[in-house]
């Protein structure tokens, strides 16, 4: 315990000393709490994430940061034509991890993200792309095995999103095709959560998709056919379909969603059904959020199993620019075996001092019944253009 507290103190000192610029990609915590009912109000993507719209940049500049400023591209120094949108994200991270082993704790300071964003729009059609470097805390040791569906060379350049879309209006029908995450779940920014990591939405697991849907302030629906990324050899080898329907309630301060996904590969198949919910309690500046999924796992060559992946938490937004989020999680590989569950608790403190900048501190502990707890501390410093 003292060792982990030492990590916390040391990391806080490093945070105060460094204060490198930062920002985050997409926060589902800002749905309802910021006045936006749809993620696509702030992002060009129909499901949120990626480049910000003019509405989203105005919100960053005037409402979501501690001190107001210009959320425009390049802080308003460069005015882009209407058909062209650009962006960039830079993130550096300090990671400390302690799994109880004799050589613990371990720590690393590494570049976590360096991405460029591009959007070309022509009437109702657009091309969108995100490209950059794969984050890596340490250099890989040893050769990559054949058939592992991992990049087999040291080239760390990757495009995690690129797609063409047809969307005549910010509300109504849309179609898009390319590489991106199928709309599903809470879409937390943290890829380590079980509802992302263990359901096919981990870091760099974007699939190639044909997706369509319909967006309204009161509701939205998305249907996606997906296949593996054979171009860059990243992600999973699953192919299948996913659907997501969300309904806004209580004067658009709450949302309830139902979702299904079927995925199949040589390793087997899995059918997922789940519910997602959010409720913003304005007088308390509190957003409750949760997701629960039951998975029917059908591995090749062995008996099927019922699994569970869930998350429940809350975000407290006391003043402009400050967001405190806590949540608990569980992933059970077999609901018939009480020892199969892994539980986790996470706390995130995010500060948006000025448009384009964010500082975040993350503390996480996770443990199974049969093993020691794994404690992780992550400090992120992120800037977006």
Protein language model features and the residues they cover:
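Hydrophobic, lipid-facing positions within transmembrane beta-strands of outer-membrane proteins
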Residues: 68-72, 84, 112-116, 157-162, ...
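Outer-envelope beta-barrel architecture signal
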Residues: 80-88, 123-125, 171-173, 217-221, ...
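Membrane-embedded beta-strand positions of outer-membrane beta-barrel proteins
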Residues: 88-90, 129, 175-177, 212, ...
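Detector for outer-membrane/organellar transmembrane beta-barrel domains
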Residues: 238-334
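Outer membrane beta-barrel
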Residues: 47-52, 82-96, 104-230, 237-239, ...
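Outer-membrane beta-barrel "beta-signal"
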Residues: 38, 358, 373-385
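The canonical Cys-X-X-Cys-His
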Residues: 36-46
């Amino acid at each position: 315990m003292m060792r982990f507290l030492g990590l916390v103190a040391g990391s806080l000192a490093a945070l105060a000393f460094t204060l490198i610029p930062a920002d985050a990609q997409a926060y589902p915590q800002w749905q309802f709490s910021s006045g936006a009912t749809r993620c696509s109000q702030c992002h060009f993507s129909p499901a949120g994430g990626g480049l910000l719209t003019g509405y989203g940049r105005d919100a960053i500049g005037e409402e979501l940061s501690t001190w107001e400023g210009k959320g425009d591209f390049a802080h308003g120094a460069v005015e882009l034509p209407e058909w062209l949108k650009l962006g960039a994200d830079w993130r550096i991270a300090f990671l400390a991890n302690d799994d109880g082993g004799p050589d613990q704790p371990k720590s690393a300071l590494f570049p976590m993200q360096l991405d460029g964003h591009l959007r070309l729009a022509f009437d109702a059609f657009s091309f969108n792309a995100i490209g950059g470097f794969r984050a890596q805390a340490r250099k890989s040791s040893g050769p990559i095995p054949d058939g592992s569906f991992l990049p087999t060379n040291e080239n760390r350049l990757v495009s995690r999103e690129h797609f063409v879309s047809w969307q005549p209006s910010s509300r109504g029908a849309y179609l898009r095709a390319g590489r991106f995450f199928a709309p599903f779940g809470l879409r937390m920014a943290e890829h380590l959560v079980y509802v992302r990591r263990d359901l096919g939405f981990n870091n760099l697991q974007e699939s190639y998709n044909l997706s369509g849907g319909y967006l309204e302030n009161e509701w939205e629906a998305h249907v996606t056919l997906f296949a593996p990324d054979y171009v860059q050899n990243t992600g999973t080898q699953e192919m299948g379909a996913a659907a997501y329907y969300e309904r806004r309630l209580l004067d658009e301060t709450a949302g309830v969603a139902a979702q299904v996904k079927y995925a199949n590969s040589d390793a087997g198949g899995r059918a997922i059904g789940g519910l997602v919910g959010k409720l913003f309690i304005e007088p308390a500046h509190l957003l409750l959020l949760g997701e629960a999924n039951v998975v029917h796992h059908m591995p090749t060559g062995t008996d099927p199993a019922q699994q569970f992946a869930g998350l429940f938490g809350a975000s407290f937004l006391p003043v402009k620019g400050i967001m405190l989020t806590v949540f608990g999680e569980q992933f059970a590989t077999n609901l018939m075996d009480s020892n199969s569950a892994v539980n986790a608790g996470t706390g995130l403190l995010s500060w948006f001092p000025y448009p384009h900048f964010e500082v975040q501190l993350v503390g996480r502990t996770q443990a199974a019944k049969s093993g020691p707890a794994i404690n992780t501390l992550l400090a992120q410093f992120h800037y977006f253009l």
